[in-house]
């Protein structure tokens, strides 16, 4: 359970804080799939948030189907994969209780939540998820069509890829690119490289790969979503962004950022 416990420590140390109150960490029970899967049996709602790979998600759903109670709702936090692909191998009773609930990072501060319904998802399930996220979690629920990337990432990931590719093509430094492609263009103050760090460089690589696999051949995304040698090299060297030892930037003990 060491990785899960370490994740809680990072959660408490994060700046800005990721919890509304530090004491709320006591509501989180760390665990790992191989040892604690039986604890899911009594859950009312399970949110899957594993790596953005269809094969891994499908394998997990097969295990979940045999472990959860008959009325448990299951949703995925996938940011790109259509629901029809996620549950194509699952029985009807699982599909009826399955949806996509995509939260944006950092979840505490980003109000948007994308809700996607499958062809067989029950209306009662969708209405429960919409109501809970609206009234209890205070989210702005947007019901999306079942298309790759939904709304936010279908546009946002394309924009990030264009920004990074153009910065490299034009020979801009990380600071120059983020100064231009930040607040002046209505992008968060992180800019594009800083946002890559915030999301996670390894996660972004999975997201880009996922969209590249499931979008049709003629889609414009393929012009900007190919393999990036710089990104691959950074991941190989452990530079995965804010959650690791740094990415395009590195946080210092003084609370400032250094460009790597």
Report residues per predicted region.
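N-terminal glycine-rich phosphate-binding loop for ADP-containing cofactors
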Residues: 1-260
């Amino acid at each position: 359970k060491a990785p899960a416990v370490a994740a809680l420590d990072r959660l408490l140390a994060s700046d800005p804080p990721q919890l509304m109150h530090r004491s709320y960490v006591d509501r989180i029970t760390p665990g790992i799939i191989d040892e604690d899967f039986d604890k899911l049996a009594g859950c009312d709602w399970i949110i899957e948030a594993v790596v953005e790979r269809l094969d891994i998600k499908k394998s997990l759903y097969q295990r979940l189907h045999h472990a959860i109670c008959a009325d448990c709702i299951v949703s995925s936090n996938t940011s790109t994969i259509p629901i029809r692909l996620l549950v194509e191998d699952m029985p009807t009773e699982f599909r009826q209780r399955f949806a996509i609930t995509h939260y944006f990072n950092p979840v505490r501060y980003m109000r948007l939540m994308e809700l996607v319904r499958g062809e067989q998802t029950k209306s009662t399930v969708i209405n429960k998820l919409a109501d809970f996220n609206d009234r209890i979690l205070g989210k702005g629920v947007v019901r999306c069509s079942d298309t790759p990337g939904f709304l936010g990432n279908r546009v946002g990931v394309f924009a990030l890829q264009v920004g990074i590719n153009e910065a490299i093509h034009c020979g801009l430094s990380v600071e120059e690119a983020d100064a231009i492609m930040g607040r002046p263009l209505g992008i968060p103050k992180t800019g594009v490289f800083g946002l890559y760090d915030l999301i996670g460089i390894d996660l972004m690589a999975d997201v880009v790969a996922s969209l590249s696999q499931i979008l049709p051949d003629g889609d414009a995304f393929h012009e900007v979503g190919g393999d990036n040698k710089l990104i691959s090299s950074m991941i190989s060297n452990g530079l995965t962004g804010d959650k690791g030892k740094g990415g395009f930037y590195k946080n210092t003990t003084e609370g400032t950022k250094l460009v790597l």
